[in-house]
């Protein structure tokens, strides 16, 4: 099988650099293109310069032109930009891995529609460990379905713009689904003042933002006399990059369809 050609959006950012590095170190992949926004200091540099590895792919802001050189575009940017890139990929017949979070319902609907024409892997967290945690949460919620209060605590760096994180929300969705509940109806986002006694049917969320925390997520099942916690902590962004590249390789066997990391990892 020939190497999968990867394109990276946001090449000059922290996640973009990590994706470039991971791609260049994987002999099953080829970096075909690297993109960044107009005005970025990364423009005109080679991807190799950004990560200190041999590579002569030049960073450009012309995504439409660069798509002809790739099989899969990986995007960890902002919802508005991601949807623009998605439409370009759809027109070019190029698959897409979307790690961007913070989409509203209408944005998710656009992604689902595009996946009728191209393969799309869309997941709130690409790390393999987090997706194993999703599976563990499903099992735990079904067993601890009576007498346990459920709280989700997440922490990220000071620059993260959405809260709760997409991963925390997905954890809540997994737990709520296993319990036969609708997260939109049972979620409580933060507490303040005299809140009254806790409603046992709710799922609570707490958010921490500070420093350079890459990503910590804990789901607590709080019973009487015991507490079960399922935690994932990321110490670098490399797990997200490696999971994204695994998703890109997975897409090589699909012409269209909407997938997530549970599909990629065979956890369905």
UniProtKB/Swiss-Prot annotation:
Instruction: State which Enzyme Commission number(s) the record gives.
Output: 1.17.1.8
- A GO CC term attached to the entry: cytosol
- Which residues of the sequence carry a binding annotation for (S)-2,3,4,5-tetrahydrodipicolinate? 157, 166-167
List, from the UniProt record, the residues annotated as the active site of this protein. Answer: 156 (proton donor/acceptor), 160 (proton donor)
From what superkingdom does this record's organism come? Bacteria
InterPro entries per record: DapB_C (IPR022663), DapB_N (IPR000846), DapB_N_CS (IPR022664), DHDPR_bac (IPR023940), NAD(P)-bd_dom_sf (IPR036291)
- Specify which residues bind NAD(+) according to the UniProt entry for this protein: 10-15, 36, 99-101, 123-126
Pathway assigned in UniProt: Amino-acid biosynthesis; L-lysine biosynthesis via DAP pathway; (S)-tetrahydrodipicolinate from L-aspartate: step 4/4
Q: Where in the cell is it found?
A: Cytoplasm
What keywords sit in the KW lines?
A: Amino-acid biosynthesis, Cytoplasm, Diaminopimelate biosynthesis, Lysine biosynthesis, NAD, NADP, Oxidoreductase
Into which EC class is this enzyme placed? oxidoreductase
**Transmembrane annotation, as ranges:** none
Q: Which reaction does it catalyse?
A: (S)-2,3,4,5-tetrahydrodipicolinate + NAD(+) + H2O = (2S,4S)-4-hydroxy-2,3,4,5-tetrahydrodipicolinate + NADH + H(+); (S)-2,3,4,5-tetrahydrodipicolinate + NADP(+) + H2O = (2S,4S)-4-hydroxy-2,3,4,5-tetrahydrodipicolinate + NADPH + H(+)
Gene Ontology terms describing biological process: diaminopimelate biosynthetic process; lysine biosynthetic process via diaminopimelate
Write out the GO MF terms: 4-hydroxy-tetrahydrodipicolinate reductase; NAD binding; NADP binding; oxidoreductase activity, acting on CH or CH2 groups, NAD or NADP as acceptor
Q: What does this protein do?
A: Catalyzes the conversion of 4-hydroxy-tetrahydrodipicolinate (HTPA) to tetrahydrodipicolinate.
What family is this?
Answer: Belongs to the DapB family.
According to UniProt, the name of this protein is: 4-hydroxy-tetrahydrodipicolinate reductase
């Amino acid at each position: 099988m020939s190497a999968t050609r990867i394109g990276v959006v946001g090449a000059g950012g922290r996640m973009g650099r990590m994706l470039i590095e991971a791609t260049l170190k994987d002999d099953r992949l080829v970096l075909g293109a690297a993109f960044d926004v107009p005005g970025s200091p990364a423009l005109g540099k080679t991807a190799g310069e950004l990560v200190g590895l041999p590579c002569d792919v030049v960073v450009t802001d012309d995504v439409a032109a660069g798509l002809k050189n790739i099989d899969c575009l990986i995007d960890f940017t902002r919802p508005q930009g991601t949807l623009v890139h998605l439409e370009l990929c759809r027109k070019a017949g190029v698959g897409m891995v979307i790690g961007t979070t913070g989409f509203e319902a209408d944005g998710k609907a656009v992604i689902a529609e595009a996946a009728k024409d191209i393969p799309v892997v869309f997941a709130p967290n690409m790390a393999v460990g987090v997706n194993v945690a999703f599976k563990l949460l499903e099992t735990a919620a079904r067993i601890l379905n009576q007498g346990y209060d459920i709280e989700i605590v997440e922490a990220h760096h000071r620059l993260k713009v959405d809260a709760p994180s997409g991963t925390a929300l997905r954890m809540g969705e997994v737990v709520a689904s296993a319990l036969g509940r609708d997260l939109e109806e049972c979620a409580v986002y933060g507490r303040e003042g005299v809140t009254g006694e806790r409603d046992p049917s709710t799922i609570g969320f707490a958010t921490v933002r500070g420093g350079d925390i890459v990503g910590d997520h804990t789901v607590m099942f709080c019973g009487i006399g015991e507490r079960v916690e399922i935690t994932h902590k990321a110490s670098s962004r490399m797990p997200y990059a490696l999971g994204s590249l695994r998703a890109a390789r997975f897409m090589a066997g699909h012409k269209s369809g909407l997938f997530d990391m549970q599909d990629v990892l065979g956890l369905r």
